[in-house]
Amino acid sequence: MSALLGLPPEVQDTCISLGLMLLVVLFMGLARVIARQQLHRPMVHAFVLEFLATFQLCYCTHELQLLSEQDSGHPTWTLTLIYFFSLVHGLTLVGTASNPCGVMMQMILGGMSPEMGAVRLMAQLVSALCSRYCISALWSLSLTKYHFDERILACRNPINTDISKAIIIEAICSFIFHSALLHFQEVRTKLRIHVLAALITFLAYAGGSLTGALFNPALALSLHFPCFDESFYKFFVVYWVAPSLGVLLMILMFSFFLPWLHNNQLSNKKE
């Protein structure tokens, strides 16, 4: 800690935020190891792992959002952090979705039972809400000048465009991300994680200034819960319905339209 005292205040705050994120990642990793060793019932095991994964994602995103506002004049630094922590999440959160849309996709494609899907969805929503209270308690300690609990209790509207465009942006981001998630399953793990991290960074760059480009209902609930309370319909449609529609359109496209097109091309070649 003494090594930070000689640094400018802004750099100190950034280092503290990064340190807190890494501590949360390490703590959640330790908790996952203990859970895998001690929990043997599939439902309980899945609930705890999904809870821990969603908590890690939500906390790190809260801090990243804080850092992006702190250094808004240098978006390259923020995008670098998004890419780095996307890699961290990809490496540490294997086997979990941390996203209701991902669970929905697996359920529709038959990769997960409805019961297991319901358990994972419940874990994600509970974790998203719990993360807010934990972050509020931590930020109330004022470890940096940007950490104060009133910040997380206020609605900071992230939608900087009209609602129709916001819906389209979130739906397209969800469509693209889950398409990649589905079709890169056969790619080597090390390469797949980098590709998905780069894609997340690109989507954050393309749509972040308009809606935040979250394409994750649980994460949106954690980040913008006061806004859901003030304008439920608007935020529910943009951050819950739109990403879900993106996943449904992706599944319909690749399960029905593209196979039909492929078969039609084969029949034309035979003729």
Swiss-Prot record:
Reactions performed catalytically: H2O(in) = H2O(out); glycerol(in) = glycerol(out); H2O2(out) = H2O2(in)
Short motif (NPA): ranges: 216-218
Family annotation (SUPFAM superfamilies): Aquaporin-like
Any one Gene Ontology cellular component term annotated for this protein: endoplasmic reticulum membrane
Cytoplasmic domain ranges by topology: 1-14, 63-76, 188-194, 256-271
Molecular function as annotated in GO: channel activity; glycerol channel activity; hydrogen peroxide channel activity; identical protein binding; water channel activity
Residues annotated as transmembrane: 15-35, 42-62, 77-97, 167-187, 195-215, 235-255
Pfam families registered for this protein in UniProt: MIP
A GO BP annotation: hydrogen peroxide transmembrane transport
UniProt family annotation: Belongs to the MIP/aquaporin (TC 1.A.8) family. AQP11/AQP12 subfamily.
PANTHER family according to UniProt: AQUAPORIN (PTHR21191), AQUAPORIN-11 (PTHR21191:SF7)
Job of this protein: Channel protein that facilitates the transport of water, glycerol and hydrogen peroxide across membrane of cell or organelles guaranteeing intracellular homeostasis in several organes like liver, kidney and brain. In situation of stress, participates in endoplasmic reticulum (ER) homeostasis by regulating redox homeostasis through the transport of hydrogen peroxide across the endoplasmic reticulum membrane thereby regulating the oxidative stress through the NADPH oxidase 2 pathway.
Protein name: Aquaporin-11
Organism, as annotated: Rattus norvegicus
Gene name of this polypeptide: Aqp11
